[in-house]
């Protein structure tokens, strides 16, 4: 949001970056001549600017910056639970499905996965230029001296971290993994996915030096590195096979002469209509690709467990020589990969970095980065935006904690209930801010004392549980492998044959079970009640339905905690810490029927 962006900022990726790195301010310059660039590339610019955000965004374009929460692709539930269902001490807490427009994430540059070339040109730092020349000389004259995990900037104080990878061929893309076995540990799988995303940068270095601090550019020199997630063929298939609606699922836009226009007609986005807009210079944005693409669904659902925050995606297709979106910024962390074609960055200030993204390359930039991009004249551009950590800050957590702490303090501490001084209006307020009055000093000291004591009443764990429930409401459901599906409720072969039910589910006390994913469920206290929240009934459309938590008897809570803490190991139903065997089976059946747990072997039998 605008109030979170400082006056001084550094720009990155055709964007101005929310500056947390000291450096010179930015000056607006005229447009520069676009250098010759090869086919199938995407050029982006990282630049500096002294102009205020509103001037940088409105001065030329006349459009406001777009916050990530207004543009983020969405993923979530469609089904509703049964109202008032009771099951041996358990009942469903239900509410009607909430209809909500999909959120959208800014522009084609924000976060993307794709194919492209990155050509860097960092200005304003002789040390960086000297380092680049040295690295190029080493690479050409002494290739054996290259670092095994890439060549990095010689100066960590540069506005953008640049890394060249020579080991990408040795890394298997998760998009090409065979979908047969099971996810033994979803935490490890999520970590592997993120390591693949930022390879060859080590995750420890990424979070200590780059995360929320500065952009990262990785050149991999391997076009196939990002293959398998999405393609123009996938987009065509989605348009033909699904009810894609203009405005809700897809936008067609242009940005010319400083004016951004959305050209969405009402109704379904039929392929012939979409491609006609495209032929006439419109950019195409698919807002929720995870709803229709198995690959994007898997990418987002895996990474959301790594970040403990919603991960969204947008697809952007831009015709040659055009631009679809005005400069803007988003309140999310963004990862950019180019899939097809090229993208260039229009000059909007002194360049910190001019980049040409090639297939397989990565560009990360922190929240607050102002960005815009356009396709080069010789080819189209296709990329995916992957974004995370929206409304997932310390401030967002404190919004929940502070009101609850005040309520408790009012109840338990008499000083919070004492009246304000009868004459405090005489020396407090803006009109009295410069008064040298001892009463004013005493007032502020009392307030500071109360604020320091307020910390003692903060219900941290309860507040974190509320954040966890919000996260689960935003989550995508997990992607089941073939084996997992066979061992879950979704693989049961229960059916009616000749008037007789066969293939019923059979869980015994000896059956080994485990959670489908570590983050698939959350046990939460709400007043005197205990609820089990889960994401298994979430839809792949954002907020397609409300969560359907299960109210469980308090005595069942230790057994659920036992299952959670045992992950990723299988445990037998008999090992549940409950007094009666039937209670163990009832709890296991309830969680199995909701998809929260899976058995080690297929659980349905023909009877």
Curated annotation (Swiss-Prot):
Q: Which GO terms describe its cellular component?
A: nucleolus; nucleus
Give the cofactor note: Binds 1 Fe(2+) ion per subunit.
**Superkingdom of origin:** Eukaryota
What EC numbers are recorded for this enzyme? 1.14.11.-, 1.14.11.27
Q: What class of enzyme is it?
A: oxidoreductase
Q: Which InterPro entries match?
A: JmjC_dom, NO66-like, RIOX1/NO66-like_C_WH
In this chain, the stretch annotated as Disordered covers: 23-121, 139-184
Tell me the CDD domains matching this sequence. cupin_RmlC-like
Q: Which cofactor does it need?
A: Fe(2+)
Q: Locate the compositionally biased regions of type Polar residues.
A: 25-37
Reactions catalysed according to its record? L-histidyl-[protein] + 2-oxoglutarate + O2 = (3S)-3-hydroxy-L-histidyl-[protein] + succinate + CO2; N(6),N(6)-dimethyl-L-lysyl(36)-[histone H3] + 2 2-oxoglutarate + 2 O2 = L-lysyl(36)-[histone H3] + 2 formaldehyde + 2 succinate + 2 CO2
Question: Which portions of the chain have biased composition (kind: Basic residues)?
Answer: 39-58
List residues of the JmjC domain: 188-405
Q: Which GO terms describe its molecular function?
A: 2-oxoglutarate-dependent dioxygenase activity; histone H3K36 demethylase activity; histone H3K36me/H3K36me2 demethylase activity; histone H3K4 demethylase activity; histone H3K4me/H3K4me2/H3K4me3 demethylase activity; iron ion binding; peptidyl-histidine dioxygenase activity
- One matching Pfam family: RIOX1_C_WH
Q: Name one GO biological process term.
A: negative regulation of DNA-templated transcription
Q: Where, per UniProt, does this protein localize?
A: Nucleus
Residues bound to Fe cation: 328, 330, 371
Query: Which keywords accompany this UniProt record?
Result: Chromatin regulator, Dioxygenase, Iron, Metal-binding, Nucleus, Oxidoreductase, Repressor, Transcription, Transcription regulation
* Free-text function comment from the UniProt entry: Oxygenase that can act as both a histone lysine demethylase and a ribosomal histidine hydroxylase. Specifically demethylates 'Lys-4' (H3K4me) and 'Lys-36' (H3K36me) of histone H3, thereby playing a central role in histone code. Also catalyzes the hydroxylation of 60S ribosomal protein L8.
Q: Which family does it belong to?
A: Belongs to the ROX family. NO66 subfamily.
> What is the name listed in the Swiss-Prot or TrEMBL entry for this protein?
Bifunctional lysine-specific demethylase and histidyl-hydroxylase NO66
Organism field:
Branchiostoma floridae
